[in-house]
């Protein structure tokens, strides 16, 4: 089954690089015991994984590179990895509030945020709901609302069930890390129910955000090209930059790249991300 094959590829790790042992802990936020890791030192950047993912299978390799010059705060969101699920909607708004509370717990007043897939939606929500806590945002293969996906991806989502994941690497990873290893079927049902809801972040709200955003996509990542353009346009894109100052936000579309293989293009993406995060505001 093609859908199952796709899901199995989600755990293909990125390039591994040597990393020093991080500081780890559990933060009491909004009824959760949220697991987090802190790597390196410097300006803080928060990493937000995709649905069904963990720190390890989403960010291996990335953390080693980013933590060379930054304080990397990697988290596991509600129900994922070492963070147990609770009786609460898994919505981008709730997850963004959890991230903001974690920053308070760590006494980090402001940070950059990088999110992949589901984590990209959470990253945008952080900028919408907690603007004072977010400096810049990197959104990797994510959407402003559900209908930003191509029809093929939306159709595939409707056919997923807990049974689809039985015996998969996703289930193995869950049982290895979760404090409730026998709850995987219920977690899958909870997350799929959340994914079926029209979680629209709001075009006007995104446009009103002050944090510059870098939208990174593959040309075959399942997000409609017109939706990608819409998000970039809302953040000041689509101008003639030789005639007036460019937007502080950016857009990159990588050729021959899918939703999954984007995370394997670390050697291309990380330098662009570092350049974006390090960039000074343009002179007007």
Per-range role (PLM):
Residues 189-205:
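Active-site nucleophile elbow and catalytic-triad environment of alpha/beta-hydrolase enzymes
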Residues 2-46, 69-70, 278-284:
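Alpha/beta-hydrolase fold catalytic core
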Residues 121-129, 135-172:
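Flexible "cap/lid" loop of the alpha/beta hydrolase fold
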Residues 242, 247-284:
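Catalytic active-site module of serine/aspartate enzymes centered on a nucleophile-bearing elbow/loop
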Residues 67, 74-114, 254:
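Active-site loop/oxyanion-hole signature of alpha/beta-hydrolase fold enzymes
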Residues 209, 215-217:
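Short beta-strand/loop motif that positions the catalytic acidic residue
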Residues 32-84:
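Conserved HGGG/HGGXW glycine-rich cap/lid loop of the alpha/beta-hydrolase fold
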Residues 222-230, 262:
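Conserved alpha/beta-hydrolase "acid-adjacent" motif
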